[in-house]
């Protein structure tokens, strides 16, 4: 039986989702829990390769399991063996050929920025602090310029395999910035992402909020394909994978 499992995790202690040698990862810890519950280590297919320090509110993964543990007991059983910074949320059966990464037609990320002079001791590891005042209207106007189908080479870190193969065109369907007190939230929904794309996009929006660039400069930035003309890559700690959309499963 092929299953789709939704999990949530705080990525602070982990070197990303994918299993890596000599480094703690979310997938490795999850497979340890599966070993304890199932007596085996299923091949886990994640929806994304989140980097070290990145968090996820609803991360999707698929795996095959044909053992005796009934589906309705899997989530509580896994949680009994998982650390508190990783939680299993929901599970459902899916088609045998379902792959959590390739079946996704959109993912939503959010980047959280604390606009304050000092860090908040309760959120310092889940948001990035900017001390100087940010102009919300400028950030919103700049965000709107990213919506659409573009070559996002300028928002791609070096070393990207997609960039090496010229596969840098993506479609952003939503890009917004909202403010709630000192907290700025950047939300991006797209059909796919390049390496560090959201963190570079967020850094570019911060530049706009600080008056270092105008919203009207964004189209020329994208047209240039030059990473050096975009903003800085903001720290991983402010980035969350919020949602993964699958055809026919969007209400799950």
Describe the function of each predicted region.
Residues 1-252:
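Structured-RNA-binding interfaces characteristic of tRNA pseudouridine synthases
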